[in-house]
Amino acid sequence: MYKEPFQPTYEYALECDKHDELKDFQTEFYKKEGTIYLDGNSLGLLSKRAEKSLLTLLDSWKEYGIDGWTEGEHPWFFLSEKLGELTAPLIGALPEETIVTGSTTTNIHQVIATFYEPKGIRTKILADELTFPSDIYALQSQIRLKGLDPDEHLVRVKSRDGRTLSEDDIIQAMTDDIALILLPSVLYRSGQILDMKRLTAEAHERGIHIGFDLCHSIGSIPHHFKEWDVDFAIWCNYKYLNAGPGGVAGLYVNKKHFNRLPGLSGWFSSRKDKQFDMEHTLTAADHAGAYQIGTPHVLSTAPLIGSLEIFKEAGIERLREKSLHITRFMLNLIAHELSDFGFTIGNPLEDEKRGGHIYLEHAEAARICKALKANGVIPDFRAPNGVRLAPVALYNTYEEVWQSVMILKKIMKDEEYKQFENKREVVA
C-alpha cells in the first residue's frame, strides 16, 4: 500500500500520497487553504457528511417539531442506540454494548458510580499519574461520595520516565485493596498504547473490574473488546471521530454486566416501551442504553452520523495501517532534519506501542507551537514542554508531513520562535 523503504525526501512523500488507498477521503473534509492541520488528536476536522447530517437533523426539527422524536430519517428517540451500533465495530464490541451519550467526564462518573463498590479491604481505585486531569477529578469526586478520602483511596501508578507507564508496574499495583481500575488506552501526552488485553486479564485474575478511557485511541487504533473482555470504557467523539466541538461522547459496558443497575439513573435509562409510562420505579433498558441519564443532545450528536459513515467505508484496519506508516515517516523526517535543535521524541517508537500522534519535547515548546501556527501549521502544546503533531489518516497527506517538518526546521534554524512568549495560550 505504501512505498518502502522510508526515504526522507519530498519525492518519497509524493509517491506515498500517490499510492494512498485512503486519499479519496481527503476531499470529504474542510481543510483551510494555506494551513496544515495536525491537531486532529485534539479536535478533528469537519467533514461534508458530518455537516450534512447536522443540517438534516436541524431540518427534522423544522419539519416535524415534536414528532421528530419518532419521524424522519433519523428519529431522535432511537439515535443514541443507532449510533452506538455504528460505533461498536470500532471497539470490537457488540451493538447492544455501546451507546452514544453524555460527555467523557459524565460517563466516567456513570461507570465509576456503577462499578465502584468499596467493601472490606477492597476500597481503592487504581489509576495513573499521567492520565488526563478530568479522569482524576471524577475519581476523587466518586471516592468522596462514598465517604472516603481520595488521598488514601486513589492509587496512582508512577511513571519511570515522566512519559510512559510500565505495564509491569501497573500489574504490581493490582493489590488486594484495589476495588476498581480506570486507565487510559493511549496516554494523551506521549501517545503510548497500553496493552489492554494483558491488563484486563491480570485484573480479572485478581477479581478486579477494569475499564479504559479511549479518548486518544478510538478512531485511531483497532480494539477487540469481545476478545479482551474489558468491563467498561468511555470516550469522546470529537477527536479522531470528527464529531465536532462538544460532540456527544460514548460509553461501553460488557454485556455480562447488564444485570447491574446504573449508578446514575434518569428517564432515558428506561426501557423504551416503558419510558413514557411515567412510573416512579425504573425499568432499566437491558443494554448499554440503560447508562444514559437525560434527554439526548440531538444536535450535538448529529455530526457523528455522517462521520461514522466515513469510518465504515474506510475501515479501522486500513486507517491504522496508514497512521502507523505516516507517523513513522514523520519520525524519520524529524530524526533526519531536526537532530541539531534540541528536540526529544517523547512517544514510543515501536509500532505496537505508538498511537496516532507524535510527541516532541523541547524547552521552548510553547513558543515553538506559536511559531508553527504563525507559519500555517496547527499543532498543540501540552505542558510542561510538549508539542503534539497528529497526521490523521483520513485527511492528512505525506506532503503535508514533509512540509510541516521543513517549516519546523526553518523556525528552529532562524530562531523565529524567540519572538513569542514561552507560555501557553488560554486554550492550548
From Swiss-Prot:
Keywords in alphabetical order: Hydrolase, Pyridine nucleotide biosynthesis, Pyridoxal phosphate
EC class: hydrolase
Superkingdom of origin organism: Bacteria
In-chain residues carrying the UniProt-annotated modification N6-(pyridoxal phosphate)lysine: K239
Cofactors (names): pyridoxal 5'-phosphate
Residues the record lists as binding pyridoxal 5'-phosphate: T104, T105, F132, P133, S134, D135, D213, H216, Y238, W267, T295
Pathway in which the depicted protein is active: Amino-acid degradation; L-kynurenine degradation; L-alanine and anthranilate from L-kynurenine: step 1/1; Cofactor biosynthesis; NAD(+) biosynthesis; quinolinate from L-kynurenine: step 2/3
Reaction equation(s) it catalyzes: L-kynurenine + H2O = anthranilate + L-alanine + H(+); 3-hydroxy-L-kynurenine + H2O = 3-hydroxyanthranilate + L-alanine + H(+)
Enzyme Commission number(s): 3.7.1.3
GO biological process, one term: quinolinate biosynthetic process
A cellular-component GO term for this protein: cytoplasm
Isomerase listed as a keyword: no
Pfam name, any one: KYNU_C
Presence of keyword Cytoplasm: no
Single GO MF descriptor: pyridoxal phosphate binding
Assembly description: Homodimer.
Role description: Catalyzes the cleavage of L-kynurenine (L-Kyn) and L-3-hydroxykynurenine (L-3OHKyn) into anthranilic acid (AA) and 3-hydroxyanthranilic acid (3-OHAA), respectively.
UniProt similarity note: Belongs to the kynureninase family.
Entry protein name: Kynureninase
Source organism (scientific name): Bacillus anthracis
